[in-house]
Amino acid sequence: MSSAMLVTCLPDPSSSFREDAPRPPVPGEEGETPPCQPGVGKGQVTKPMPVSSNTRRNEDGLGEPEGRASPDSPLTRWTKSLHSLLGDQDGAYLFRTFLEREKCVDTLDFWFACNGFRQMNLKDTKTLRVAKAIYKRYIENNSIVSKQLKPATKTYIRDGIKKQQIDSIMFDQAQTEIQSVMEENAYQMFLTSDIYLEYVRSGGENTAYMSNGGLGSLKVVCGYLPTLNEEEEWTCADFKCKLSPTVVGLSSKTLRATASVRSTETVDSGYRSFKRSDPVNPYHIGSGYVFAPATSANDSEISSDALTDDSMSMTDSSVDGIPPYRVGSKKQLQREMHRSVKANGQVSLPHFPRTHRLPKEMTPVEPATFAAELISRLEKLKLELESRHSLEERLQQIREDEEREGSELTLNSREGAPTQHPLSLLPSGSYEEDPQTILDDHLSRVLKTPGCQSPGVGRYSPRSRSPDHHHHHHSQYHSLLPPGGKLPPAAASPGACPLLGGKGFVTKQTTKHVHHHYIHHHAVPKTKEEIEAEATQRVHCFCPGGSEYYCYSKCKSHSKAPETMPSEQFGGSRGSTLPKRNGKGTEPGLALPAREGGAPGGAGALQLPREEGDRSQDVWQWMLESERQSKPKPHSAQSTKKAYPLESARSSPGERASRHHLWGGNSGHPRTTPRAHLFTQDPAMPPLTPPNTLAQLEEACRRLAEVSKPPKQRCCVASQQRDRNHSATVQTGATPFSNPSLAPEDHKEPKKLAGVHALQASELVVTYFFCGEEIPYRRMLKAQSLTLGHFKEQLSKKGNYRYYFKKASDEFACGAVFEEIWEDETVLPMYEGRILGKVERID
């Protein structure tokens, strides 16, 4: 930058006076320099006179003659050399501020330290300490000064300090090297820096930037005015940017030099501050960032082919971006415009703020209306929370009841305390409306009087609600008591029957507990071992009574053919009982042993009621039964129904006599009176062919045994049980009053378990649901285990599926979990002796 660029000719004498501006002519010498001489061109008139650095001065320092330019300004001297810049206090401070921003201020500090050391007295003791401090601070610690010095220079300084040969010029070589580096790099960058250009724009005389720390508080302000809130009023006092007397031209070089500061500037106490590294104020979210080219808006009109006659200025063509001396074609103007854009580039400006407005649906509402709507919503939320909390508390209570019941059952099983089924103690009114109970009551009455017709509808109708009917049931309940009218100690003690209330009846809480237990714990079919274990626990809770004491069973029957297994005395016999099969309805060990001494009139068999299962289990059994009936039955299953009559024909006379005595009792003649059908309750309906009672009971036992076992296991198990019953009858043929069920349980259990295990080892039951179908598929495979690959081969439909198999698990309260298996070599898990799986399609 030369001094000629800063000296301008003032066309108007009334313009503002500058120190470096030319002075008016001295009176009397106005004609010395005519404004226009003949023969001089137009360009020479407007050419400013160069101001040399060697202005005419008096040798005696008395000042300059009048009519000549003033001496060089500080800004002009700064551009001459680095010495001139550092020789001025403001220049040195401004240059130091620039180096601090560039993080190389140590070079300037080292240069001033060398100047100060050169002026120190060598005889002073502080000189050695200062030399060592300069060496350690700037040269020894591998700083930026040490990197710019030559190795020989650093070695010379180090040797001089070690030998304590201190000289005033020992740092001159290092200072010269640092000065040359600053002149080549930092000084040239400083002359084009934004901090220097702003100081030039302010004229160097503005005291606003010299206060509060001098030039360090210099701020460059450009762009839009600060964002103003709608409720505030803008005042000029908050705006610190003041117009400067001189303006630097907006050339591409100047714009590039000041782009970084203008893009990172901030306005104090303003709402809109723009900084690329800082997050945007939430008030202006969504407005984006604005990048405007450093050209006029008219250039954009030209670039958009909007050059028309009405868009051209008739007075001054410079407004339209067209030089006054050159009016070319449209393509030439576009090319010049594109070159101007490339030269200037894009100047980043702060993003233009947008007013943050409320959504349309947020309209003002009356306070009363708003309060009513808010209260209604809060009440609805409160009800939802309360219902959720009550449901959680209820589930927690049910869970605690289950845990408490499980602990009680475990304690009872350990102590061997006798328990009685709670459903047998319910009064008649609790199950009066249950159709299953009505059929069971009717069947028990029919079997009580096997030689008579079915009772009439008018007298013994279980649907009747008359007081006589209630009294009849109540008397039936009291008939469970022994002749003394009291329960025996084994049944009357609270420890024996903990579910009884204070008066011998089941309370409401107990009934709820019983229902919850048998619905949630016995919905899944039990295995044979579980049924036998529960039977051995309940068999202790019996009441050994006389001839008038009996208990009847409410057995869970099939949905189409209810079966019962009563153990009542027929024909007035006191010592005879019916030979029973061990099945799901008639559990082993329920028959009572004979009285001590083996008297003929000793034992009355006690039949305990089995629990009421879930209705869904009945539907499941009905589906299995329907599937069984639709398939052709094997020969073994067909021959089972006729097994007992054939065996009766082949049995010995003593065996037939024993069987006849068991059924005939003391009546002296076999049963000849036909019994009506179970469902024949209408007198007008013709009676069916009366079946043999013994064969019917055998069929009931067979069906009960089939319910708890797979289809192909029923035949073998039923035949084994029939063989055991007949063998027991043959062994006790000499004593016709003995009970076949009196055979030791230790001899029957190993045989039965061995048969079951042998059957399970030979055949494997596989049941699976396919792709969400409601009816499952069931297959029997002759294998001990099954892998996923073999299971896939059994599927008729091939495709991509997911395979889940049920297995026992303690992770959840249900005790089971479906596990996904994807490897063909994995052995499928078993649940309750069978494989239960689900096949789901991969979407």
Curated annotation (Swiss-Prot):
Q: What is its main location?
A: cytoplasm
Q: Locate the region Interaction with SIAH1 and SIAH2.
A: 334-393
Q: Which Pfam families match?
A: AXIN1_TNKS_BD (PF16646), Axin_b-cat_bind (PF08833), DIX (PF00778), RGS (PF00615)
Protein's name according to its UniProt entry:
Axin-2
Origin organism is: Homo sapiens (Human)
Motif: Tankyrase-binding motif; annotated at 21-30
Query: Which CDD domains does the entry mention?
Result: Axin_TNKS_binding, RGS_Axin
Sorted alphabetically, the Gene Ontology BP terms of this entry are: aortic valve morphogenesis; bone mineralization; canonical Wnt signaling pathway; cell development; cellular response to dexamethasone stimulus; chondrocyte differentiation involved in endochondral bone morphogenesis; dorsal/ventral axis specification; intramembranous ossification
Where it sits in the cell: the answer is: Cytoplasm
User: Which residues does the annotated region (Interaction with GSK3B) include?
Assistant: 327-413
> Where are the annotated segments for Disordered?
1-75, 396-435, 447-494, 561-674, 718-748
Provide ranges: composition bias, Polar residues.
727-741
Tissue expression, as annotated, is: Expressed in brain and lymphoblast.
Q: Supply the SUPFAM superfamilies for this chain.
A: Regulator of G-protein signaling, RGS, Ubiquitin-like
Its assembly, as annotated, is: Interacts with glycogen synthase kinase-3 beta (GSK3B) and beta-catenin. The interaction between axin and beta-catenin occurs via the armadillo repeats contained in beta-catenin. Interacts with SMAD7 and RNF111. Interacts with ANKRD6. Interacts with SIAH1. Interacts with SIAH2.
Q: Which Gene3D superfamilies match?
A: 1.10.196.10, 2.40.240.130, Regulator of G-protein Signalling 4, domain 2
